[in-house]
Amino acid sequence: MVIIETPIFTKRLLGVMSDEEYRLLQLHLLNKPDEGTMIQGSGGLRKLRWSAKGHGKSGGVSIIYYWFVAQDTILLLFLYAKNERTDLTSEQLQQLKKVIEGEYP
């Protein structure tokens, strides 16, 4: 399986997780790509809650990703701290959906 990051994901990742924390997240997704909760009306986007910097799940981050089963690929789209927001807006979801449709029509 391959994991691909969008530029915005990479930018937001810096300073939120250490390299080791990120490696553990990647391993988790490789072993359980369907772990994230499916976001209704998003075309298959998933949201995974992940602890960051020893704060536990309540102080962690939410990872938005898409699992392309046929291509055996996970596309990491967006990440945000839980104290930053609770959910994405419908406009943000539509923008992420367009990324998926553009990458894998």
Regions found by a protein language model. Give the residues of each.
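Enriched for short, Lys/Arg-rich terminal
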Residues: 67-105
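Arg/Lys-rich, positively charged N-terminal/basic patches that mediate binding to nucleic acids
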Residues: 1-20
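Positively charged, low-complexity terminal tracts
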Residues: 1-3, 27-30
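A generic structural signal for short beta-strands and their flanking turns/coil linkers
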Residues: 5, 25, 42-46
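Amphipathic alpha-helical transducer elements in NTP-driven molecular machines
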Residues: 19-22, 58, 93
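Basic/aromatic recognition patch in beta-strand/loop cores that engages polyanionic ligands
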Residues: 38-76, 84
